[in-house]
Amino acid sequence: MVKVSLDNVKLLVDVDKEPFFKPSSTTVGDILTKDALEFIVLLHRTFNNKRKQLLENRQVVQKKLDSGSYHLDFLPETANIRNDPTWQGPILAPGLINRSTEITGPPLRNMLINALNAPVNTYMTDFEDSASPTWNNMVYGQVNLYDAIRNQIDFDTPRKSYKLNGNVANLPTIIVRPRGWHMVEKHLYVDDEPISASIFDFGLYFYHNAKELIKLGKGPYFYLPKMEHHLEAKLWNDVFCVAQDYIGIPRGTIRATVLIETLPAAFQMEEIIYQLRQHSSGLNCGRWDYIFSTIKRLRNDPNHILPNRDQVTMTSPFMDAYVKRLINTCHRRGVHAMGGMAAQIPIKDDPAANEKAMTKVRNDKIRELTNGHDGSWVAHPALAPICNEVFINMGTPNQIYFIPENVVTAANLLETKIPNGEITTEGIVQNLDIGLQYMEAWLRGSGCVPINNLMEDAATAEVSRCQLYQWVKHGVTLKDTGEKVTPELTEKILKEQVERLSKASPLGDKNKFALAAKYFLPEIRGEKFSEFLTTLLYDEIVSTKATPTDLSKL
């Protein structure tokens, strides 16, 4: 066994040794063990320099795009990978053959139980965009998964008892989404810098649960977010190889589905599958983050200004091209092509509005099935039956055998002109309203927020922020008033929205709308542009102590 030193490793939180969710006896101390810390410290020390280099490369690309010296295209240096028809992904893994309906949500204990009890095939437990990364959310997410995998997650609240509907081996397959490469976990420092949040989330889950999941016959499986280059996928593959070797399980046991949710990654889909080869379980269309990334990377180009967010749909030219290329790529390489999120939630007090929303979900899933997707996402258990009803028409567990004939060019992926697209005052109001509501909830520790009958995550607020930055930067003209979008206009409407939302808040003066607005304002005035809202806001939810925990007592 490799000897790992914990010298210069600082854990800046107390480790709770008391069980929180009785009757389970699992504590945070059972997760943050000395041997688990040694494992994640080894991964961090081995791979963190490469992680930082790859993040710097993103900014190199951005500078080239901004200068006009480079346009996104398929990489000439990897043409041999794209042009070689002989390589394939691995044989489908147990528990991942039928993925027609996947449910997603943060690793809160009650939501985890509800998701595992839902009529779905797989469950993406999310440490990323639908979770606010407070220490408790992240570490108790690990506790909850540890207990679920061992059939000891049942618990009671004063209002309700939560119980699994049977043995977890017979329930939906768990797929964990760790935080992206750009994020860090500031409650644990290694060699004077915060540990990679990706390695923290992946490492703790894998170390404690990989062998238990193998016994169950399904896992360990992951979703990988926010990648922008195939070398970022190679980095994950290297992490997987070291992790599997370390605990003594065969390479290829891990499987990972990559979310194609950044514009640069859309030009490298085949390379991403290739880099993960023995660990690949396909690609997924992360629609809202993809829109966010498209605006972000093309934000300084006046030829790529998107209209009001409700006019950017999956049938918009650049979105349709990305979906078609993803399905064709995945099926040629023998892996799953997963559809995107239906964010709707039931509207209990308005049957007519609810029926309209559910019809929209059904039509969206029919479009995905017809295009060739092998399954799709839902945000709420009530939507699972709709997705099931649509995808049962495949007649098989997946439709990887179906390779749609289409040719998608680089120009197609960059076709952001939307016929009859408009930018209006209502578009500004909507972006500010949704962005503020999401950021305020996130600052209070909630990353999965119902807004206007949709279950929203961080991608929603990111689209709001990017659109407003872009509209101000390019001084677009509003269709309804003929007024130019200026920093003064967006600031004025922001103040109006903060006042309205603060007055309506059930928290009274304990709401965090003013704090959210403080961070939002420079972005929507076009004065600065942060890579991610979550990293911009993160320090507000970090709660460290001055004296590190004595690791010898773990």
Curated annotation (Swiss-Prot):
The lineage of its organism: Eukaryota, Fungi, Dikarya, Ascomycota, Saccharomycotina. One of its GO terms (molecular function) is malate synthase activity. Its EC number is 2.3.3.9. A motif (SKL peroxisome targeting motif) lies at residues 552-554. Keywords: Glyoxylate bypass, Peroxisome, Transferase, Tricarboxylic acid cycle. Belongs to the malate synthase family. Interacts with PEX9. The keyword Transferase applies. GO terms for cellular component: peroxisomal matrix. Gene3D superfamilies: Malate synthase, domain 3, Malate synthase, domain III. This is Malate synthase 1. GO terms for biological process: glyoxylate cycle; tricarboxylic acid cycle. The keyword Transferase applies. Pfam families: MS_C, MS_N, MS_TIM-barrel. NCBIfam families: malate_syn_A. Pathway: Carbohydrate metabolism; glyoxylate cycle; (S)-malate from isocitrate: step 2/2. The active site is at R177 (proton acceptor), D457 (proton donor). It catalyses: glyoxylate + acetyl-CoA + H2O = (S)-malate + CoA + H(+). It is found in: Peroxisome matrix.
